[in-house]
């Protein structure tokens, strides 16, 4: 059992935006009236941050106090301080004909940090629920001349290109995350990735990274490819998309068997108030039985007003070999699994060979705030999860679970 749990924990490092399928995380699209021409990017160093807290009530009151298959909202019936984030950033100035440089340094303290650590960087800082982490620390360079818009090169630690959701809660429509975000994509990478702005419609991304959630140290001393292709301004500006991938050895102490993580995300504006987001995901690990996971998540977002939106998310994700989806009872289980260590907490279990389905309905309320605050978002949601074959939920005794969650994100 411990061996299987360790594999599942190693696979956890695939999870989530991401983070989001783009060179720099951008908000999950919300319908809006077309905006005027964009202002020049701010110059100089910008300082900003946010605080997020929330709670998830499980109707079946699990004795182990775990919401199976969840990460950032994993604790049942408990208030969580998810994130306290501070950021210093100098963005590129938006002048493609000039050489430019920028950077981003972002730190986090909170319960979410347990899941997004990278090897060798604060991964042993604490065994408490609230932990510190360096989310991003990179140098950004713009090189002109290769094309009309030039090329950007990011060097350091950064969030993944993959996925429709992000670590940053401000860019997500829901408090809870998909199985795709949690188990089907990485959270972060350390290395270098270049973005070639080939045309006004196409970006090409390519680079080498230390792997899934690996930073100053690596669990197999191998490099991986990370890249993709972005599509913009299609269908009269209504359609954007991104295919992203990561390929390389990811299992602890194994530099021969590859892991393949592919994600395809599309966003389509139905109208000024409505949009659809599609996230397709496939993951395979060649170690052992060649475990596979794959699925789709679909989002519908309706903007009622400038302060209120309604959103619905449906997802189906198959864990073909019972390798990827799990719950983690101990605060150190994720990092121990990433390092290839045995997991002994009996609350840390997988869900077996099954297909998961989930439907989530929620609101996003953004009331006005006074300076120096820059935003407040309150997101209540109702979510139903089901396993097709196994009793994965609620102390491993039920095939489904119903949860009500709510969080608040205060930005400054």
Which residues does each PLM region occupy?
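Outer-membrane beta-barrel pore domains
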Residues: 70-73, 113-116, 123-127, 166, ...
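Solvent-exposed loop/turn segments connecting transmembrane beta-strands
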Residues: 96-97, 183-189, 214-222, 251-258, ...
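Short loop/turn motifs that connect adjacent beta-strands in outer-membrane beta-barrel proteins
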Residues: 24, 31-47, 60, 92-101, ...
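Glycine- and aromatic-enriched membrane insertion/assembly motifs of diderm outer-membrane
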Residues: 71-112, 301-310, 317-319
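N-terminal periplasmic/intermembrane-space "pro-region" immediately following the signal or transit peptide
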Residues: 1-70, 328, 339-347, 412
């Amino acid at each position: 059992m411990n061996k299987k749990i360790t594999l599942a924990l190693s696979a956890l490092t695939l999870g989530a935006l991401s983070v989001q399928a783009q060179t720099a995380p951008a908000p999950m699209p919300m319908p809006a009236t077309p905006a005027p021409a964009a202002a020049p990017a701010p110059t100089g160093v910008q300082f900003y941050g946010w605080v997020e807290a929330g709670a998830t009530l499980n109707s079946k009151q699990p004795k182990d106090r775990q919401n199976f298959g969840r990460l950032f909202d994993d604790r049942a019936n408990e208030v969580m301080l998810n994130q306290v984030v501070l950021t210093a950033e100098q963005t590129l100035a938006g002048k493609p004909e000039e050489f430019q440089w920028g950077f981003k340094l972002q730190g986090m303290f909170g319960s979410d940090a347990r899941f997004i650590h990278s090897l060798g960087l604060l991964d042993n800082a604490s065994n408490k629920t609230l932990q510190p982490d360096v989310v991003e620390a990179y140098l950004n360079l713009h090189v002109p001349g290769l094309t009309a818009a030039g090329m950007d090169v990011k060097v350091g630690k950064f969030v993944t290109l993959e996925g429709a959701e992000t670590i940053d809660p401000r860019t997500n429509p829901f408090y809870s995350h998909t199985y795709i975000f949690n188990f089907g994509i990485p959270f972060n990478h350390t290395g270098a990735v270049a973005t070639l702005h080939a045309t006004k419609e196409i970006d090409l991304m390519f680079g080498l990274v230390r792997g899934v959630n690996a930073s100053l140290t690596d669990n197999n001393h191998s490099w991986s490819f990370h890249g993709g292709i972005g599509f913009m301004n299609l269908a009269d500006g209504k359609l954007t998309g991104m295919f992203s991938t990561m390929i390389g050895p990811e299992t602890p102490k194994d530099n021969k068997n590859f892991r393949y993580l592919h994600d395809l995300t599309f966003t389509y504006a139905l109208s000024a108030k409505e949009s659809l987001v599609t996230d397709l995901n496939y993951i395979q690990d060649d170690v052992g039985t060649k475990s596979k996971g794959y699925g789709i998540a679909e989002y519908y977002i309706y903007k009622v007003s400038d302060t209120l939106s309604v959103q619905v998310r449906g997802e189906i994700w198959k864990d073909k070999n019972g390798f990827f989806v799990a719950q983690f009872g101990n605060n150190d289980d994720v990092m121990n699994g990433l390092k290839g260590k045995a997991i002994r907490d009996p609350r840390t279990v997988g869900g077996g060979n099954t297909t998961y389905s989930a439907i989530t309905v929620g609101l996003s309320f953004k009331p006005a705030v006074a300076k120096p605050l820059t935003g407040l978002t309150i997101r209540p949601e109702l979510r139903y999860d089901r396993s097709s074959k196994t009793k994965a939920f609620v102390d491993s005794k039920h095939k489904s679970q119903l949860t009500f969650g709510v969080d608040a994100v205060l930005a400054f």
